[in-house]
Amino acid sequence: MVQRADMDSSQHTEPDTEEGEFMACSPAALDESDPDWCKTATGHIKRPMNAFMVWSKIERRKIMEQSPDMHNAEISKRLGKRWKMLNDSEKIPFIREAERLRLKHMADYPDYKYRPRKKPKVDPTASKSPTLAQSPEKSPKSRSAGKKCPKLKPSHSGNSSKSLSIKSEYGVGGDYVFGSPKSSGKAAVMKCVFMDEDDEEEEEDEEEEEDELQIRIKQEEDDESLRLYNVAKVPASPTLSSSSAESVEGASMYEDIRNGTRLYYNFKNITKQSTIPQATITLAPRPLLATTSPAGSHELLFDLSLNFTQQNPQLPDPNSGNVSLSLVDKDLDSCSEGSLGSHFDFPDYCTPELSEMIAGDWLEANFSDLVFTY
């Protein structure tokens, strides 16, 4: 009976298939009889091998038998390349073996949970000298002092560079020379510690004052340039009044406008005389027609002939650009003696061009055609 049982067991363990042959030659099959087949010497439970690990374990032993002097890293490289070159049909037995080992691992260790090893943390304080370990209170102070210095230095250097750039922009640079702060020695520490924030605030205030001053200067220059361009305006504008007579004339024109009298200007006659060296602008107001409208308001039409000439740029004239109002000044005395209803009653200073314009038909059918005809 005992012999038959031995024979049955031997027949059962004989490798009849490829899987049996693989199991027989597998190195893991020899260790499965041990209950702790998947534990290390320290008691750590290893993970079950996958297909590549099963195959590489067998092939590694073969390579080590053939070339024992080969490095382990070189063997791993060769095994990885060979595993990639294998066909799927050649990998099937190793995949099945890995699945069998996984199921056995689950049966032997049902409460297993993968927990990777944590690397032991090296205590940095253990390598320090005992003198430093005994006085830990001084180290934070020194670190904090070291941290303060780099914070203050860039701010001060940034302000100095900013002030230098501002002064160079406005033409003030070159008066002061700032040296680069030294980063070594006690002097640097003293500079960091005794930095006063009031000095920085004063510097910022000075910079703001300089900016405001420059802005004011620019505004004044712009105003002066605008005044030069605003010379040739309508005679009734207050900016054109340069004498008392002109101011009286401007006031009277404004009063006429308020009382209902409308002023119309004609700028058709604009001629250029190249023979005259200096540019003059003459304004000759002439009473062309005074009629009584159906509403009973007096409408006065003016012809302002503006004579513009080109000025030689090499010969600037201080009087150029001023409006010559000699005719208006002379006729102010005769305003009270006028026979017409308007106070603008001038002697006959008509030129041939003005007489041609006066002879034309000034009364248009539409009221809008009378205003600012060009």
UniProtKB/Swiss-Prot annotation:
Phenotypic consequence of gene deletion: Morphants show a significant reduction in head area and interpupillary distance compared with controls. Morpholino gene knockdown does not induce an increased death rate.
Function: Transcription factor that binds to the DNA sequence 5'-AACAAT-3'. Acts as a transcriptional activator. Plays a role together with nlk in neural induction during early embryogenesis.
Descriptive protein name: Transcription factor Sox-11-B
Molecular function as annotated in GO: DNA-binding transcription activator activity, RNA polymerase II-specific; RNA polymerase II cis-regulatory region sequence-specific DNA binding; sequence-specific DNA binding
Composition skew (Polar residues), residue ranges: 126-137
Record flagged with keyword DNA-binding: yes
Subunit composition and interactions: Interacts with nlk.2.
Predominant location: nucleus
Tissues showing expression: Expressed in unfertilized eggs but not in early embryos up to stage 13. Localized to the nervous system at the end of neurulation, and restricted to the central nervous system, eye and head neural crest cells by the early tadpole stages. In adults, expressed throughout the ovary, and also in the testis, kidney, brain and small intestine.
Positions with biased composition (Basic and acidic residues): 1-15
Biased composition (Basic residues): 144-154
Keyword tags: Activator, Developmental protein, Differentiation, DNA-binding, Neurogenesis, Nucleus, Transcription, Transcription regulation
Induction: By chrd.
Region feature Disordered, mapped onto this chain: 1-22, 112-165
UniProt cross-references to SUPFAM superfamilies, sorted A to Z: HMG-box
Biased composition regions of type Low complexity, renumbered to the chain: 155-165
Pfam families, A to Z: HMG_box
